[in-house]
Amino acid sequence: MVTVEEVRKAQRAEGPATILAIGTVTPANCVNQSTYPDYYFRITNSEHKTELKEKFQRMCDKSMITKRYMHLTEEILKENPSFCEYMAPSLDARQDIAVVEVPKLGKEAAQSAIKEWGQPKSKITHVVFCTTSGVDMPGADYQLTKLLGLSPSVKRLMMYQQGCFAGGTVLRLAKDLAENNKGARVLIVCSEITVVTFRGPSETHLDSLVGQALFGDGAAAVIVGADPTPAEKPLFQLVSAAQTLAPDSCGAIDGHLREVGLTFHLLKDVPSVVSNNIEKCLFEAFNPLGISDWNSVFWIAHPGGPAILDQVEDKLGLKPEKLRATRHVLSEYGNMSSACVLFILDEMRKASSNAGLGTTGEGLEWGVLFGFGPGLTIETVVLHSVPIKPGPH
């Protein structure tokens, strides 16, 4: 007779969860940040609000964003004028777009990750799908499974309405799934489009306007598994993962799904809430490893906005190059909510390889990945890089 302990031991992987492939994708429609205020105020019939437009122009200029990608084109917005008002009932029309386009964009990212992974998709045992854009039953996890032609017995987990910290959450969940199910290969997909949050400007709700200046569309997919086979190419190991609520931060970042879509609320002190709590998170994550020099690790931080990055850098005394990959993704794509940190992981391993550095983490051994979002919730993931094998010259 087999004991429960023996079954349990046989179910568990031996090594740590490892990222085996990363895929990223954006919609084709690209918007230039420098000309976006003109476009935004024109398309929302708000050009008469000259002072507000000047404020928005300053927000865009300070955003450190060069360009963003958006599924919502001028044509779609002209067909849906309610999207362009500040508070017009429009949820049905927004949902109709989101429930189709979110899984579709996710599928493209997943196909890219599966191609890099190089293994048959039949080996995918779990799917974790994450979005803050649109809700349906069965969900985007089901749609993705159908679009990719995955096994009907794939184990699915659907995460809705988590927001900007969720890129850390999905890695934490994938780590537990991979390490507790021997041979598991977990496909994570974060797919975000601004169709639920786009709206016209309001003089009385400047926090909503901040969102219009920052958010962009994108999807990222990651394959996670423990005990890689010789045919698989490890990129990063997931060493530990934690989630915490920052004290006294209730209401700092809120989103509410209403008839008008997803409304976004942000308090001015979000950057200070994050920067005041980040050192405690770092200490708890790295103290067991004997690491206390925050410049000795590589950094992947959710780029909520430039003020958050500036204050974190200042508070921890980080060298400017520590947040290079993070700032690069913010500049090239804007804030894509949960997908951002996965884009930064992709950027970091590619830049590390191109620069001839020794590891996937900018030549360093240990790293940290942070997600910040509603709650205020902080996700902290400790990463271990993988040596980069020099390619043929």
From Swiss-Prot:
Keyword hit for Cell inner membrane: no
InterPro entries: Chalcone/stilbene_synt_C (IPR012328), Chalcone/stilbene_synt_N (IPR001099), Chalcone/stilbene_synthase_AS (IPR018088), Polyketide_synthase_type-III (IPR011141), Thiolase-like (IPR016039)
Biological process according to GO: flavonoid biosynthetic process; polyketide biosynthetic process
Catalytic reaction list: (E)-4-coumaroyl-CoA + 3 malonyl-CoA + 3 H(+) = 2',4,4',6'-tetrahydroxychalcone + 3 CO2 + 4 CoA
Pfam families found in the cross-reference section: Chal_sti_synt_C, Chal_sti_synt_N
Signal peptide start-end: none
The protein's annotated pathway: Secondary metabolite biosynthesis; flavonoid biosynthesis
Enzyme class: transferase
GO molecular function, one term: naringenin-chalcone synthase activity
Residues at the active site: 164
E.C. numbers: 2.3.1.74
Source taxon at top rank: Eukaryota
Keywords associated with the record: Acyltransferase, Flavonoid biosynthesis, Transferase
Functional description taken from the UniProt entry: The primary product of this enzyme is 4,2',4',6'-tetrahydroxychalcone (also termed naringenin-chalcone or chalcone) which can under specific conditions spontaneously isomerize into naringenin.
Sequence similarity: Belongs to the thiolase-like superfamily. Chalcone/stilbene synthases family.
Name the UniProt record assigns to this protein: Chalcone synthase LF2
Lineage start: Eukaryota, Viridiplantae, Streptophyta, Embryophyta, Tracheophyta
Encoding gene per record: CHS-LF2
